[in-house]
Regions:
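Long, low-complexity, Ser/Pro/Thr- and often acidic/Gln-rich intrinsically disordered regions
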Residues: 12, 25-26
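N-terminal pro-sequences and low-complexity stem/linker regions of secreted or lumenal proteins
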Residues: 88, 92-94, 145, 156-162
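C-terminal active-site subregion of NodB/CE4 polysaccharide deacetylases
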Residues: 31-132, 137-140, 168-171, 175, ...
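Structural detector of well-ordered beta-strand residues that form the stable sheet scaffold
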Residues: 156-158, 181, 241-244
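Acidic (Asp/Glu)-rich catalytic clusters
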Residues: 145-151, 164-182, 236
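C-terminal motif of bacterial Sec signal peptides marking the signal peptidase cleavage site
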Residues: 15-18
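Bacterial signal peptide processing site
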Residues: 20-22
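Bacterial N-terminal signal peptides that target proteins for export
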Residues: 1-8
């Protein structure tokens, strides 16, 4: 694994500047090249967003079935030379998928709401689903909420905090009813780092989000879904109440809360339909 710069230094830079480091996939130059082609679409989307009230509704009841958790990475079309083009879902596909979910009676909730139902006598809608986004790319904070707000839905952003979205974008997501959780400081393979670095990746990323957003940060997202017993134990010790993987399946009250499954969406509507029918 490529050695990381000093995490202590990285965290100081994070606190002072609010950005730094590099994304886990694709180059900065490649992403910059695609920015102009997508800016007009996402600017229009931003203008249409309405504030969402994501709190439980009177019609919600205790729910004991399986809850699907989806995970999206980047939205839009992959630019030429992108290292991981399969992680992109086009804007049209994303809109079609959200429309289909709504037509099927699904209602998006946050991980906090799901966990409250599972373990604290909370409530959920009749057909709940959790829609998560990993890493913290700009379209996840602009285009995705514009589409999801049509249905009054919140999302969940798992943020890499050293190379994070600017604070105003994160705060705006929270104002829309979104949940923002930790995806580590720098997205390393946590099974390959020292115990000290593991603790920094977990604790400092959580503290940063809590300090900036003034909200609970209860969930952790394992970078690249890499974990072992030591990593899971460290996640618990850092104060998280649950963690998400990229293993497919439905979350239930009987699922290990630190190994919550998610369906990774990398294609069109047919893939989503097949996942939810499994």
């Amino acid at each position: 694994m490529r050695p990381l710069p000093s995490l202590a230094l990285l965290f100081v830079v994070l606190l002072l500047t609010g950005c730094g480091g590099s994304r886990p996939s694709g180059s900065t130059n490649t992403r910059s090249a695609s920015k102009s082609r997508r800016s007009a679409v996402h600017a229009k989307a931003r203008a249409s967003v309405k504030v969402t009230n994501a709190s439980p509704q009177p019609s919600w009841r205790r729910y004991t079935g399986g809850v699907p958790i989806l995970v999206y990475h980047d939205l839009g079309n992959p630019p030429p030379g992108q290292d991981y083009p399969g992680l992109y879902v086009s804007d049209a596909d994303f809109e079609a998928e959200m429309a289909w979910l709504h037509q099927q009676g699904y209602q998006a909730v946050t991980l906090n709401e799901m966990m409250d139902d599972f373990f604290h006598a909370g409530t959920l809608p009749a057909k709940p689903i959790v829609i998560t986004f990993d890493n913290g790319y700009v379209p996840q904070a602009t285009f995705a909420p514009a589409v999801m707000s049509k249905y009054g839905w919140p999302g969940v952003l798992n943020e890499i905090t050293v190379d994070h979205l600017n604070n105003n974008r994160l705060k705006r997501l929270v104002s829309l009813g979104w949940e923002v959780d930790s995806h580590s400081l720098t997205h390393p393979d946590l099974t390959q780092v020292s115990a000290a670095e593991l603790q920094q990746q977990l604790v400092q990323s959580r503290r940063f989000l809590q300090r900036v957003l003034h909200v609970p940060v209860n969930s952790f997202c394992y970078p690249s879904s890499r974990y072992d017993t030591a990593v899971v134990a460290a996640v618990k010790a850092a104060g998280y109440t649950n963690a998400v993987t990229e293993h497919p399946g439905f979350a239930t009250p009987h699922t290990d809360p630190y190994l919550l499954p998610r369906f990774e969406i990398e294609g069109g509507l047919g893939e989503l339909q097949a996942d939810l029918a499994s």
